[in-house]
Amino acid sequence: MGSCKKNENIKRVTHHFSFKFFSFAFLFFNTLFSHSDPELTTQSIKSPGSYIIHGGPIIPMSNPNRASYHEAIAINKNKIIFVGSRNEAIKRNPNAIEINLKGKTLLPGFIEPHVHPSLAAIILPNKIIAPFEWSLPNGLSQAAQSHSEYMKILSNTVSNHSSLEKVLFSWGYHQLWHGQISRDLLNKVSSKIPLVIIHRSFHEAYLNDKAIQLFNIKKSNFTNHPQVNWEKGHFFEAGFASIIPMLSKHLLEPKRYLRGLAMMSEIIQRNGITTIAEPGFPNINFENELALLKHEMEKKPPYSVYLIPNAARLEIAKKSRRETLEFINSLTKYDTRNIKFLNEQIKLFADGAIYSQAMQVSGGYNNSSEGKWMTPPAYLSDLFRFYWREKFKLHIHANGDKAISHLLELVDESNKAYPRKDHSTTLHHMGYFTDSLAERIKNLGAEASINPYYLWALSDKYTESGLGAQRAQNLVTANSLARRDINFSFHSDFAMAPLSPLTLASTAINRISHRSTKVSQHQRLNSYDALKAITISAAKTLELQDELGSIEVGKMANFVVLNKNPLTFIQSGISSIKVEGTVYQGIYYSNN
């Protein structure tokens, strides 16, 4: 009997020990694999879940004045739920999977607040002959630095063209590198193939006889048109806009256009961008552009698209101002999971393109170039006042100091007549402006979205011809804005600059031209301000700062993973930092 009790007690002790042992083992291994597995890197974030990310510099971009770091962050599904220490993250989220950055740097996903998918879709699958090489998914485009180089590449392209009936579109021509071209010259290149040479600015084009015939463009429709040179086959600014509907069937040809959008998506991911916006939708045709964009976005690429309506283009289509306004106010009905129209925001256009030397500059040009208006000033003022009274945020394309000054007068006048405290009117591009204009921007409560790449691409040539050294070497003076705490973002206006936020940041930080000329070094930005311009300040440009642009609790889990910390890496090499991948809405997408 005693023996039986003894055995029973032994069994109980053994059972109790076994239970405690296996419970301890379970907790130990669960903790080990949940929080300490050194092999779990960002590659493991394959689906929305609960994760703690640590093990490398995490730069939240939430501090407006200086850099700060977090040791760890926690995300749940597509939202950030914690920022702070690793121990506290584990304590609050005991079941989260731990992700080790392995020394790589985490930043908010880059935001590109001004890009045109339609331009990308047209340019990328067609022939690029530009002054500089372009990095494309299928390799580098061939650069042409002179007239002879340009004509040689164009002639070879024509020789290899697949069909006499198919239009040959080529983008990238610029007269300061490639010399003068004309309808007659293009006829000599080919009298049988329709040729459309789109200028580097995408604000003008040259056509040969075959193209003019194919598109049924009539001379009688352009008699005395100030922005058409019929003899040269040259259509620019409003003249170019006038023929776009005639070209639209070919420009929006679905197979080629969708190939271009797919290439754009690849470039966006490769460069760490998780959000893009197009100010000025549509460019050509609302229904067709939206349908093709939806087709691309149904593939669920790792970025979101925000659209800002094009006031003038829609007014032409809708015929009346009130009908246009009703349509604009209904646009959110077209929203999808990853395409959204920004409510109560509108895009207007002021002067001509900086790449065409058509921007309006107060001192004029020192060559034969002349400033142009994309929108006649009286009509621009009328549109501005109307949408100001309707309490829209206005985004306005403005390149030269004369155009910027005109718009600031409109802001001042409108705000006195219909006061608005936080209007945040945003001037886009701002190729050339002065310190005094920056002061006015500050005092009037306006903001900026700028393209610093103009300096790299144009400073040397525009010093030689057009602007002279004083103006050409002071293009896009970003530090004038930073010193005044004016919100400003960087954008590519693709393809006016590479679709690469780090390239834009590097240009603003270093202010070195394509010939390695150091210019206006007092206008260099510090690295933190440059990063703000592609993250939190870019979110503010779009009024999305409560959702995107920084690593803060409640915001979207959109991040970029870099192989180097841009705040400590050598400034001259920032554009060479590798984008390892992005986290978009809580899922990691690798570039490797």
Predicted regions: what they are:
Residues 34-36:
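Boundary at the C-terminal end of the N-terminal hydrophobic targeting segment
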